[in-house]
Amino acid sequence: MNDVSQKAEIKEMLASDDEEESSPKIEKAYVPKLTGTVKGKFDEMEKHRQEEQRKRTEEERKRRIEQDLLEKRKIQRELAKRAEQIEDINNTGTESASEEGDDSLLITVVPAKSYKTPGKTKDPEDLDREEGNGRTNHEEDKMRYEEECRVLKEAKCLSLVMDDETEAKKESHFPGKLKSTFEELERQRQENRKKQAEEEARRRLEEERRSFEEARRHMVNEEDENQDRETVFKEYRPGKLKLSFEEIERQRREDEKRKAEEEARRRIEEEKAAFAEARRSMVLDDDSPEIYKTVSQESLTPGKLEINFEQLLRQKMEEERRRTEEERRHKLEMEKQEFEQLRQEMGKEEEENESFGLSREYEELIKLKRSGSIQAKNLKSKFEKIGQLSEKEVQKKIEEERAKRRAIDLEIKEREAENFHEDDDVDVRPAKKSESPFTHKVNMKARFEQMAKAREEEEQRRIEEQKLLRMQFEQKEIDAALQKKREDEEEEEGSIVNGSTTEDEEQTRSGAPWFKKPLRNTSVVDSEPVRFTVKVTGEPKPEITWWFEGEILQDGEDYQYIERGETYCLYLPETFPEDGGEYMCKAVNNKGSAASTCILTIEMDDY
């Protein structure tokens, strides 16, 4: 019966063990990891890190145990030396006491070993559990052993002090003995502190080296991952993203600039072609007046007066065009001479610092514009010349900047390759690593300085491009102003053709002020100059005043009154957002008064 019952119990235990084995297997089911995914790599890295941490803890534990053993041996040697000194000093009657004291001090604490009681064989799971419990018990025993070692050290120190005191009492006939013992203790304590500090510094160095190794290993892993990604995605280049975007942005700006130049060139060609056709038609009209006479006589019998009036108008228009062309040629020649003089005066300074020369020329043009001594046509011609000169210079600068950037990129790549080879050498020969463990950091610092320098150069280049765009924008504004002036002249000519001359004659006969050219609504960019122009006639000459939002504006630096015959201007050298609003020009004489208003809109500058 006993055998049967024992067999039944064994079967039940085996069944219970199978259930216990099955339950954790169900709970901790094996999930295959995708080796190619990022999650699988992170899991592998985590497992690798945990294994390294466990190895480090085991090495640290072994090192501490060895250090404790060395300290114990040192203490034993010091106690033995101390006993020999006491024996030499006493020589009589104290040998037994000193030996007993030394024996008491030489007691060593041995950690209790965990004895296993013999018994019956158990299952592998029970053995694993017992091993786990044994590990925890072993760690607790080690902690207890370290605590006991610490207490033992304190007890030894106290016993040394007590022995010194008893020896001082016994040997009172030796003056200065107590002081010498305290000095020795103080020396030992300082030496221990020094050793502890050295050990702490050594430990920190080891930790820093390990962290540096881990960081370098992570960097190598990241580079390997980047190389794998490069093989999968050939177009993806890590580290070049910013440069590629900047190159794309530069190309986009160059394309826009090229398109704008082509558009302006096409517009100028169209204007030239239209002007040539108009001149050709005018020449044909002058060569064959008889044809027009016959046509007009056939269509209109009383048309002689109309033909004569048209001929007079054509003659006037031709004379005005010839006069304007001659004035334009004369102004162009004068401006060429002025520009040549400026170039001769600037000389070598312009060659050494082209950008500074352009800015000075630009400032001079602004001063001339503010003083009101030149018109928009002069500004346009000068800006065209400056643009023709500056395009080549800007292109040269862009090419130089690109060459510099390429050289910097090549240097950075070479240094990175050198650093990578140095890291390989360090991995192969770890003895050299301990001599200079922070070479990679120094190279990274130099690389960061180069990147900062390249960023500053890129910022300078962007500022120069913005200056060029600003000059182009101002040139466009001048073109728009000239176009507006041309339209105004055409409207005036149209009004003359439609018979508005009779109204002008009536206004001039009355003598009251009358605006030939009234104010018009304008818009200007913030901080740019603006000019309000009117043409006023009257007999006697009217007095002109300018008003802003119902308040009179006095002539000064901020608001400049300009008068040229019948043309009156209000010039603002610089505009602000608060300058936007309603402006009025008022003309008064003894025959009457007249006023013209407009609205100024200030637009914000996007540059």
Swiss-Prot record:
Predominantly, its location class is: cytoplasm
Gene symbol here is: Nexn
Return the InterPro entries for the record: Ig-like_dom, Ig-like_dom_sf, Ig-like_fold, Ig_I-set, Ig_sub
What residues does the Ig-like domain cover?
A: 513-601
Tell me if Transmembrane helix is a UniProt keyword of this record. no
Which one GO biological process term can you cite for this protein? regulation of cell migration
- List the biased-composition ranges (Basic and acidic residues): 1-14, 40-85, 120-143, 167-221, 228-268
Tell me which residues bear Phosphoserine: 16, 172, 281, 288, 296, 495, 500
What protein name is recorded for this chain?
Nexilin
From the record, give the transmembrane residue ranges.
none
Q: Which residues carry this modification: Phosphothreonine?
A: 301, 502
Q: Give the source species.
A: Mus musculus (Mouse)
What function is annotated for this protein? Involved in regulating cell migration through association with the actin cytoskeleton. Has an essential role in the maintenance of Z line and sarcomere integrity.
Segment Disordered: which positions? 1-143, 165-268, 419-444, 480-514
Q: What is the lineage of its organism?
A: Eukaryota, Metazoa, Chordata, Craniata, Vertebrata
